[in-house]
Amino acid sequence: GNQQKVMLSRGLFSDPDVLILDEPTRGIDVGSKYEIYTFMNQLVDEGKCLIFISSEMPELLGMCDRVYVLNDGRIISELKGSEITQERIMDDILTDTRKRAKNGANSKSKENEN
């Protein structure tokens, strides 16, 4: 937890308007997570923009006012406010996966026709 807090502090040294946080709470205890969440909220209150990358659904649901859902490295949806639910995120991923699988199957059958 201390290493993440030091990295956050170092990132703020140049007073950026935008801060990218990639999995800032991965592998740390609950107390340290709470401290980092509090710190992130303070930054937002100061007008900073945080790009928060996380694979932990509860973090996204609890911390974000906008979520970009990615699947296989591509943005597949943008959710705001009350749209940000676990069900919606999972539905968007499943819908995209099915669509891509169907398109892949269609292109393979077209190749077989030739």
Model-derived segments and spans:
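Glycine-rich phosphate-binding loops of nucleotide-dependent enzymes
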Residues: 1-114
